[in-house]
Amino acid sequence: MEVQIFGTRKCADTRKAQRFFSERRVRAHFVDLAERPAARGELMRFVQRFGVSALVDVESRRYADLGLRAARFSDERWLALLVDEPLLLRTPLVRCQQRLTVGLAESEWASWIAAS
């Protein structure tokens, strides 16, 4: 089993996800969104499963800095913004084959491990 974790090194939940998989000896490939933004196609997988609103971190500093509190964008515009501004993403985004999660989801990850 191998997972891919999208997040930033500064994000506490991303570090918890890395530790969760490390403690269970699951190989995890980390993608630091601050250095390498996620591709549009990769984000589309998460949008199709959860919707674009689930991916936007309305509590993030970047969200406030950009003044998005009153923003009313289409899903397409939000997706474009998330590609351009990866620090707006709610992290970690975790993918294992076709299984996906947004945010800290340890019980879900545990079920993935149990099923493998």
Language-model segments: residues:
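Thiol/selenol-based redox catalytic cores and closely related redox-interacting motifs
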Residues: 33-116
